[in-house]
Amino acid sequence: RPDTETWLEKVIQYYRNETGLKVADLGTGSGAILVGFLYYCRDAVGVGVDISTEALKIAEENGQNLKITDRVEWRQGDYLKAFDEEDIFDGIFSNPPYIPTKDIGGLPGEVKHEPRLALDGGTDGIYFYHLLAKGAAEHLKPGGFLAVEFGIGQATDILEMFRKSAQYEDFEVIKDYGGIERALYCRKK
């Protein structure tokens, strides 16, 4: 989706010439973020995590289409719980569900067809960001990046949440093509 392209392009620019990167994508869904990153960052390897085996089948097909299968592992699991202690990354991506539960019924048709699991961000829409703010840093190398997409109007709360965790620095809120704040990029201290 174009909303995701803007911030992913920026992260790719930052890391395109790095060698030996190991990245992860939590809630990978179709794998578009991880596959796109690995396609342009030819020396990187990655792990895509999703709770849905159906989503992982699609991600695997997308990886095959762009010929990155030798550099990716698709892992079925529940978000951060899919990682072991030794899973340490140079970067973690996530475009988690960010729609408040009460708003799901009123979504436009093109979004409604997606599985509820891929949309429902809990009561306030930021359930998964709490998990990331608390737990992602233990799976990042010092200086490792975290790049997360969020919904319209969520930037302030999510930025504050990650600042308060005191585990990250170099915060950058990235806008989409329409000028809407769409993603947070930061690095582990």
Where are these regions (language model features)?
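Short, well-ordered coil/turn elements that cap or connect secondary structure elements
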Residues: E18, C41, K67-T69, E114, ...
